[in-house]
Amino acid sequence: MERSMYAGRVRSEHIGTTITLKGWVSRRRNLGGLIFIDLRDREGLMQLVVNPENADAAVVETAESLRSEFVIEVTGTVEAREQANDNLPTGAVELKVKDLKVLNTAKTTPFEIKDGVEASDDTRMRYRYLDLRRPEMLENFKLRAKVTHTIRNYLDDLEFIDVETPMLTKSTPEGARDYLVPSRVSQGHFYALPQSPQITKQLLMNAGFDRYYQIVKCFRDEDLRGDRQPEFTQVDLETSFLNEQEIQDITEGLIAKVMKETKGVEVTLPFPRMSYDDAMNNYGSDKPDTRFDMLLQDLTELVKDVDFKVFAEAPAVKAIVVKGNADKYSRKSIDKLTDFAKQFGAKGLAWVKMTDGVLAGPVAKFLTSIEEKLTDTLQIEENDLVLFVADTLEIANNTLGALRNQIAKELDMIDNTKFNFLWVVDWPMFEWSEEEGRYMSAHHPFTLPTEDSAAELEGDLSKVRAVAYDIVLNGYELGGGSLRINQKDLQERMLKALGFSEESAYEQFGFLLEAMDYGFPPHGGLALGLDRFVMLLAGKDNIREVIAFPKNNKASDPMTQAPSLVADKQLEELALHVELENE
């Protein structure tokens, strides 16, 4: 029979009607001579009741045979429950079963299909189709669908054109490693899966599309963590003839619309702006979490004359104050913080506590000459813990920024009901790579430098600033964008500054440079990480929870066993030979 409605949508107004439902058995129990069955579908649970005294014998026999996750079809009459269950949307009603059919049976599942499941991540991913049956997972994907629907409507209303860009592209240097796809037709040659549609969307601006968007899959072969996956989805925008403020206004409107439609939250516009330098100096991060205080304090000048070599000779000495929680940190727990700090390049972690009105701790004896001034500068009060890092400014900022976030989580200092958006602006164009031994793009090689710093492309690259902007939410980079270079000579200078010879620049980006000979308009754009945005809206801490079939931390899929070896014949067609490390 045709399904009448979803089980999770049956309500009191349906009492007295005969309906047909289809779904999975969540559980079955015998109670007081009656058989109760919880039927689950996409929209929720509905209680079914079989009374052996007045039900058909075949129905009773079928009901007795049911096990969890059997797929069933049931027809019956909606009745009011004797005792309502206020914890269920369908809790005021139940279905008196007249007909019951098993559509498919099920083996015992490797974990119970319910929220709060106790199973390893790999087990959940190995049986992802079962994991996705759980109500909280279904809700995540309903939220994701609503977010993308809202985004499309908003951008369509602003006359953006949805354009699909190629998945098989050219491998280019800079950024993360590419995923490569060998060509059978042009043997020895490779496509790359796009890390972003950056160049193609710029070319669409040269084509006169004016406003482009795409909700697009991107690929990066990089080390994984909770907010990264090898394949991910971004909301990609590009516009012509708009400045950075206008692009930011469009983005803020989009985010405000999503927040209103999906969470019922009114966000205040415009979002706060913070320079990159202020973010690093005050928060120790280019994606600051502003839901709590504990800002970094610069003590370099204050401690330069103390009788403590580590402080006196360090290029920078900075500190954070953990207010009112010193008693929660024993020497052992501070040693753990020290080990954590060393992961970010710090040689160690100095500390003092305010106990009975005086500073105490391993370095307190070196600070007696400045104790009063230090206490005043940092506003140290009873039971405060002060953590110091003495090192280069970069290491001090990065280490204390990471400690700030770690301690806030440990002490439950973060208000998880807040959505704190902000823009980080005034970015450096380049960042130094110790691994590469050279400057690399902080964003990408097509970012427009500020007019007053462009001359340094042939000078001190550390002084070149970018017309770039990142949008941050609760300590996560939600997205980033910039104005782009549209002048050929400036693009050539940028590539030269990055170490490209003229020959290599044209070999890699000749098609883009050639396009700049044909009236390339001023343009700029932005990309938002859709997976990360939905993760934060759903209150999750791993984007695997909002991606239907994600990879694990080894970039593998435990369900399909991808990546896998392929047949020798396939390799021969591609003129490839694979040598494994253990051969």
From Swiss-Prot:
It is found in: Cytoplasm. It comes from the Bacteria. Keywords: Aminoacyl-tRNA synthetase, ATP-binding, Cytoplasm, Ligase, Nucleotide-binding, Protein biosynthesis. SUPFAM superfamilies: Class II aaRS and biotin synthetases, GAD domain-like, Nucleic acid-binding proteins. It is an enzyme of class 6 (ligase). Its EC number is 6.1.1.12. It catalyses: tRNA(Asp) + L-aspartate + ATP = L-aspartyl-tRNA(Asp) + AMP + diphosphate. Residues 198-201 are annotated as: Aspartate. CDD domains: AspRS_core, EcAspRS_like_N. L-aspartate binds at E174, R220, H443, R484. Its main location: cytoplasm. Pfam families: GAD, tRNA-synt_2, tRNA_anti-codon. One of its GO terms (cellular component) is cytoplasm. One of its GO terms (biological process) is aspartyl-tRNA aminoacylation. ATP binds at R220, D221, E222, Q229, E477, G529, L530, D531, R532. GO terms for molecular function: aspartate-tRNA ligase activity; ATP binding; catalytic activity, acting on a protein; nucleic acid binding; transferase activity. Catalyzes the attachment of L-aspartate to tRNA(Asp) in a two-step reaction: L-aspartate is first activated by ATP to form Asp-AMP and then transferred to the acceptor end of tRNA(Asp). PANTHER family: ASPARTATE--TRNA LIGASE, MITOCHONDRIAL, ASPARTYL/LYSYL-TRNA SYNTHETASE. Belongs to the class-II aminoacyl-tRNA synthetase family. Type 1 subfamily. Homodimer. This is Aspartate--tRNA ligase. It comes from Streptococcus thermophilus (strain ATCC BAA-250 / LMG 18311). The gene is aspS.
